[in-house]
Regions:
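Extended repeat-based scaffolds of very large eukaryotic assembly and lipid-transport proteins
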Residues: 1-109
C-alpha cells in the first residue's frame, strides 16, 4: 500500500493513486515503445506526471519495475532523491538494487 513516510494513505486515496498511475504508465508505454533514447522516454508528459505524484507513487513504481521492467529508474531517483545502484551497474543490476532497496525500506514485499 502506498504511504508517505510514517503516514498511511487512505484506501480511497490509494486506489485513486493506483488508477492514475496505471493510466499514465500505460499511456507512457504506448507512446514511447518506439523510442530508443531513454532521455526522450523520460521526458514524456505521462512519465513527468508520474514523477510529480511524489513519494506515494514509489511502491507502485517498484511493483511495476518488478512485474514489467522498463525505464523507471529516473522516476525512482526523482521521487526518492536516492540511487541505490553503483555507477557502473548494468540495467538488470540497477533493477535488482532498486527492488532490494524497496524491500529494505518496506515499500514492497
Amino acid at each position: 500500500m502506498p504511504y508517505l513516510r510514517g503516514t498511511h494513505i487512505s484506501r480511497q486515496e490509494t486506489e485513486r493513486l493506483r488508477s492514475e498511475f496505471v493510466t499514465l504508465a500505460e499511456q507512457w508505454r504506448r507512446d514511447t515503445r518506439h523510442l530508443s533514447q531513454v532521455t526522450r522516454k523520460v521526458a514524456h508528459p505521462a512519465y513527468l506526471r508520474i514523477t510529480g505524484m511524489g513519494e506515494a507513487v514509489v511502491p507502485l513504481l517498484l511493483e511495476e519495475l518488478r512485474e514489467r521492467p522498463a525505464h523507471w529508474f529516473a522516476a525512482l531517483r526523482a521521487t526518492t532523491n536516492f540511487d541505490p545502484s553503483p555507477a557502473e551497474a548494468t540495467p538488470s543490476q540497477v533493477r535488482e538494487a532498486w527492488l532490494e532497496w524497496g524491500r529494505s525500506q518496506g515499500y514492497i514485499d
